[in-house]
Design a protein with these regions (language model features):
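Short beta-strand-to-turn element immediately C-terminal to the catalytic PLP-Schiff-base lysine
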Residues: 13-17, 21-23, 36-37
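Short glycine-aspartate micro-motif
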Residues: 1-5, 11-13, 48-50
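ATP-binding/phosphotransfer module of carbohydrate and carboxylate kinases, centering on a glycine-rich
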Residues: 20, 38-178
Length: 178
């Protein structure tokens, strides 16, 4: 399982055999600060990231990244979910931004598929509530993943954008909660 949080920022974790894989450097799954794979010419060097680099996946795929893309195209700011809603209503600019966002996500997840070959990719965070991602992104990632047979599934976290908070609550020591 490759679990992705896409909201204010982006992050991920890797589950192998039902256990979190941390890696020797404790950064396994640190996907948001990798560069956007297969960038188009106008995506280079990419927006500055708070980590000090440019063009990190997070700068493109976070909610603010989608909002920034829309603002650059339309000249006004909208939250990520508002861009998706406007696209669903037939707005051409919002639709173009969503299509580009989905292509960027497909590239980024195809890189993960080519390296980890997960059975499932789970999306959580606020952006995970954009339902069209679950049909459109898997249709696109085949162009970039190094396989002609892809069975990886893209699903929304069971508890949606509250999954991270629920997970943290499960990990909280009972003695502290009392």
């Amino acid at each position: 399982v490759f679990g992705v949080i896409v909201g204010t920022g982006t992050g991920a974790g890797i589950i192998v055999g039902g256990r979190l894989h941390e890696g020797p450097n404790l950064i396994a799954g640190e996907w948001g600060h990798a560069p956007l794979p297969w960038p188009d010419d106008d995506e280079r060097p990419g927006p500055p990231c708070y980590c000090g680099r440019r063009g990190c996946i997070e700068t493109f795929l976070s909610g603010p990244g989608l909002s920034r893309s829309y603002e650059a195209a339309a000249g006004r700011f909208l939250q990520a979910h508002e861009v998706a809603e406007l696209a669903a209503q037939g707005d051409d600019v919002a639709e173009a931004c969503m299509a580009r966002y989905e292509r960027r996500m497909a590239k980024s997840l195809a890189m993960v598929i080519s390296i980890l070959d997960p059975e499932v990719i789970v999306l959580g965070g606020g952006v995970s509530n954009i339902k069209r991602l679950y049909d459109n992104v898997p249709r696109l990632w085949g162009e970039f993943a190094f396989s002609d047979q892809l069975s990886t599934k893209l699903v929304q976290a069971k508890h949606g954008d509250s999954s991270g908070v629920r997970g943290a609550a499960w990990l909280w020591p009972p003695s502290v909660a009392a």
